[in-house]
Each structure stands twice: as C-alpha cells, then as structure tokens.
Amino acid sequence: DAEHKSNICKHFQVVGEEKFKNIILVTQDGHGPFIQVSKEEQCKHYAENRVPYMGNFIYTAAKRHPDLPATEVLIYAFXYESGAVLVSYPEMVGCCPPDVL
C-alpha cells in the first residue's frame, strides 16, 4: 500500500506541475501572462496605482497589528513605500517624477 500511495503522489505531483505550467506560465496564444514593459510603463503604472497600492498596505498592516496606533501604521507605510519601491524597482529611480517617489 505504501508503494501504491507513493505512485499516486508522484502522479499527482507530475500532473500538478503540468497544470501549473499550462495554466500559469503559458496562455492559449503561447505567451506567458506577464508582459515585460519598459521602465516608463512601469513608472506610469506605479504612479497611477500608488494610492490603491498603499491603501492596501495600510489596511493589511492595521488588520495584522490592531494594537498599533494609526500614526505608527502611516509611518511604517511611508517607510515601506520609500524603501521597498526603491529597493524592488531600482530602475524607477530617475524615470519617475520626483513627486511619485
């Protein structure tokens, strides 16, 4: 029975990997779902979606740490935005207007 279970697990592991490759990595047209865009496009997307992105961060931080005062959550959000964006997207430095970053 242990060998049978092992074979079943291996089968599902292979089938699962194939489904992942077919569903996530490749769409029907043969291209992946994630498109590489230019630095200007990335900057534009970030600038257009900055408020919802940071709103989601503030909401999540406040929900996970209900004991923190609102001012601390906002301070962490500001530090996260200025630190995480510049570290995660160093190519945005210099392409975005100064009021965005």
UniProtKB/Swiss-Prot annotation:
InterPro entries: Serum_albumin-like
UniProt tissue specificity: Plasma.
This protein's record includes keyword Repeat: yes
Binding site for Cu cation: H4
Name used for this protein in its record: Albumin
Keywords from the named record: Copper, Lipid-binding, Metal-binding, Repeat, Secreted
Functional summary from the UniProt entry: Binds water, Ca(2+), Na(+), K(+), fatty acids, hormones, bilirubin and drugs. Its main function is the regulation of the colloidal osmotic pressure of blood.
Entry's localization field: Secreted
Family affiliation: Belongs to the ALB/AFP/VDB family.
Gene Ontology MF, one: metal ion binding
Major localisation: secreted
Intrachain S-S bonds: none
Domain Albumin stretches: 1-80, 81-101
A GO CC annotation given for this chain: extracellular space
